[in-house]
């Protein structure tokens, strides 16, 4: 397995509120760990939320003696949610902050994934497939048949998310797992990438 990380502020913002962590080496009882977080809540607060969330997730996993990868990741995200919310409630400069997060680990030939918000994990095999499901207003509108995918890409509310870490006392997390095959490529990203490029464009670049 080989991994690499790239993050860029882009052309629309002065500060990059994304934070990424990647370790091909063991982290606690996980054989590897990959995390992408995209903060929100103003420049300082959003940057802090994503960085702090990734930091807490790492610390929680290192201290956890559990063996089940899904349980390990769940507890780490729940701990991060509690810690971020505490910070937001105790510092007026951080009030209202939160972050998306997508977490993955590969155990033998299986990948275990968790996500909150609209940061994504893709599997690129013969075709590109979005594994995670966005927790966003436009995704709900698509599922309800109110708009189609093309309308969702250009919708004025496309950046409104319905779940985030550090916003409420309890966080709802989606989990996925699947068997990987030789030459599979896994891509984790924030909406900074998925809002700019169609899935097929991403696939062409990765290839």
Model region roles, listed by residue range:
Residues 1-207:
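PP2C/PPM-type serine/threonine phosphatase catalytic domain
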């Amino acid at each position: 397995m080989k991994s690499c990380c790239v993050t860029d502020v882009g052309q629309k913002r002065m500060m990059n509120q994304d934070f990424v962590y990647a370790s091909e080496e063991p982290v606690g009882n996980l054989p590897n760990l990959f995390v992408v977080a995209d903060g929100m809540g103003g420049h300082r607060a959003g940057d802090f939320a994503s960085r702090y969330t990734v930091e807490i997730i790492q610390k929680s996993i290192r201290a956890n003696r559990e063996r089940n990868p899904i349980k390990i990741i769940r507890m780490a995200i729940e701990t991060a949610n509690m810690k971020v919310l505490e910070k937001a409630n105790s510092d007026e400069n951080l009030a209202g902050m939160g972050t998306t997060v997508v977490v993955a680990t590969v155990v033998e030939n299986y990948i275990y994934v968790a996500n909150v918000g609209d940061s994504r994990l893709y599997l690129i095999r013969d075709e590109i497939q979005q594994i995670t499901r966005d927790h966003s207003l436009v995704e709900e509108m698509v599922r309800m048949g109110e708009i189609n995918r093309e309308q969702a890409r250009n919708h004025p509310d496309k950046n409104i998310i319905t779940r985030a870490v550090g916003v409420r006392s309890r966080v709802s997390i989606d989990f996925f797992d699947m068997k990987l095959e030789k030459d599979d490529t896994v891509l984790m990203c924030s909406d900074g990438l998925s809002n700019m490029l169609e899935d097929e464009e991403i696939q062409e670049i990765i290839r």
